[in-house]
Amino acid sequence: MLLDTLKTVLCVYGPSGQETRVADVLTAMLREHVDSIRTDVMGNLIVEKKGRENGKTIMFSAHMDHIGLVVTDIEDEGYLRVTPVGGVSLDSMRCRHVVFGSGVHGVAVCQPTKGETAGMQHLFVDIGAKDKAEALTMVNLGDACVFAPEIIPLGEHRIAAPAMDDRCACALLAELIMQIGTPRNNIAAVFSVQEEVGTRGAAAAAFRIAPDLGVGIDVTAWGDTPEVKLPAVKLGEGAAVKFMDRSMIATPCVRDALIAAAEKAGVPYQREILPFGGTDGAAIQHSRGGVPAGTLSIPCRYVHSACEVIDMRDMDGALEILKEFVNGDFGA
């Protein structure tokens, strides 16, 4: 089930550049359902499922990485100085429980400031070490920590967790592969790396695959909490078909095909116009001489925080859209 798959992938450690554990979990989940599965030099997990003869090759991309902090220095007192990996804000990190890949736990703290505005340079991580020597037995320079995993049900349909960006899309793509029979078109499913630091993995994968068209699957921002009204996207009202963001204007034929798939599936959808951000869809679109591409988004509150919130009804609808889309007629 989609919810079970989501819970499985949410709990795996995988900051940008260290996505191997996520890829291993997905490989174990998918290997019996696909025609080929491999990992490329970048670390992207590339899964292929053949369609009917003369079908187009559609690249779907959902990124495995999530934001974190990397250790840059260790003070004599044992506190860790850190710098962001991806879009980490100071407000989201204040007194947050974090965990390293080794299992070491810590608390991210902002030190008091005197006469200056607090910034990321004032952030440190307390791992309980009495001094630098003890800290070095626990972590080292270059180690990365992420928000500690916790899955919190909110009401009947909603779930909060860190790494929802973009593990919810990884769960969607995995379920598409497991549930679809022989699709009309060939599926090249990429579980990409390093999206949070510049869609690096998807760019390399798209160049190698050279798809006929592509779809990024990601979260998008929300407009349904106090004093937050844009983008005009609400949780529970359907997955969002992206028209544009800072990185791309969706190719009209792909955008319209996603809308048609939603209407054929009989599920609600929203139109997304995001005045910031970017997704793997742009990396596909910019590849080689250009690839027709779009993005299907899951509305998500409090993106890049320890409590990213989605609505499972949007997830269920998105899965139906993807099923219809992959069986679409995209010409000879």
Region spans (language model):
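N-terminal hydrophobic/helix-forming segments and targeting peptides
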Residues: 1-332
